[in-house]
Regions:
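N-proximal helix/coil linker or "cap" segments that precede and/or mark the start of modular domains
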Residues: 42-54, 80-81, 86-90, 94-139
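Thiol-/selenol-based redox modules, centered on thioredoxin-like
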Residues: 117-122, 239-282
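N-terminal low-complexity, Pro/Thr/Ser-rich intrinsically disordered segments
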Residues: 24-59
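Short, internal strand/loop/helix patches
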Residues: 194, 205-243, 251
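Bacterial Sec-dependent N-terminal signal peptides
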Residues: 1-28, 281-282
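A short beta-strand-turn-helix
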Residues: 139-160
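Conserved redox-active cysteine motifs that mediate thiol-disulfide chemistry
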Residues: 156, 163-181, 185
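Short pre-active-site segment immediately N-terminal to redox-active cysteine/selenocysteine motifs
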Residues: 158, 165-168, 200, 233
Length: 282
């Protein structure tokens, strides 16, 4: 019997010694997700470096896996609140998962607060849009530039894509060609496209004679946009479901197109594209 026990130990011991502990498994998993796509040191070395990366690569209004500074999963709400504190920036993580992963990185206390201030402002705007998800689209009744009446009943049975804009908004106009192509792809599907403009009917008609925009255009919508929807940044893009519930809110055309396509969570700008001038940090 003693010899049998010795023989069993000879065969079983290697199996026991090779088995990973739960702690070791967690370390491996963390190693798979903690590699940032962009160098943290590079980003915080210069405000313009960070802003160019953040503007082109980070979409806080998209769906993403949120990781705290210890690489632990947290809710999107908690993630945005951490960013609002001004103590962190976020960097996309190199991951093989389909869902984009963002991780929090703490800013040095002695760093110039320019990055912190802009990060706080951007995260706050994203948080305000995030809170809109799941809420009912406000009641409205309006006539578009062609005399067709619209109300909440228009949402029934279809997904509605909405854009806010005004004529002198350069960013609003710059994305119209991209949105026209988007409409062409989905015009025969159960998706409709509405735009809420702050301008009056006549200026809009004059604008549309020279500039094609394939969304239905609703004039004089500043009250709906800024007082009911509480949106102050233009353009903003919303997806409303067939029950009139706001499903998603985005800041860029590329993000809403990507969401509808369900191909990627965010269409990233070409590396040759330049970010717009950094916003004031104050």
């Amino acid at each position: 019997m003693k010899n049998l026990i010795i023989i069993l130990l000879v065969f079983v011991a290697p199996l026991i010694s090779c088995k990973e502990s739960p702690e070791e498994k967690n370390v491996v998993k963390k190693e798979e997700v903690i590699r940032p796509i962009k160098s943290y040191d590079y980003l915080i070395s210069d405000y313009k470096n960070w802003w160019s990366y953040h503007y082109n690569e980070i979409a806080l209004t998209s769906d993403f896996e949120a990781l705290n500074e210890d690489s632990e999963k947290i809710s999107k709400e908690d993630f945005l609140k951490k960013l609002i504190s001004g103590d962190y920036i976020t960097i996309e993580i190199d991951s093989e998962k389909d869902l984009t992963a963002y991780k929090l990185y703490r800013l040095p206390k002695d760093l110039d607060n320019e990055i912190s201030n802009v990060m706080k402002n951007d995260a706050y705007r994203a948080f305000e849009l995030f809170k809109m998800e799941g809420t009912k689209f406000p009641d409205f009744k309006v006539t578009d530039v062609n005399g067709i009446e619209y109300s909440n009943k228009k949402f029934e049975g279809k997904t509605t894509v909405i854009k806010t804009w005004f004529i002198n908004c350069k960013a609003c106009i710059a994305e119209m060609q991209e949105l026209n192509e988007f409409v062409d792809i989905y015009k025969n599907k159960d998706i409709q496209f509405l735009s809420l403009a702050t301008n009056e009917r006549e200026p809009l008609l004059n604008f549309l004679k020279k500039n094609e925009f394939k969304y239905d255009v609703l004039p004089n919508q500043e009250h709906l946009i800024e007082n009911k929807l509480k949106l102050t940044v233009y353009p903003t893009h919303l997806i409303v479901n067939e029950k009139g519930i706001i499903k998603k809110v985005f800041k860029k055309a590329s993000q809403i197109i990507s969401y509808i396509d369900q191909d990627k969570l965010m269409i990233k700008d070409e590396k040759t594209n330049l970010a717009p001038p950094p916003p004031p940090a104050g």
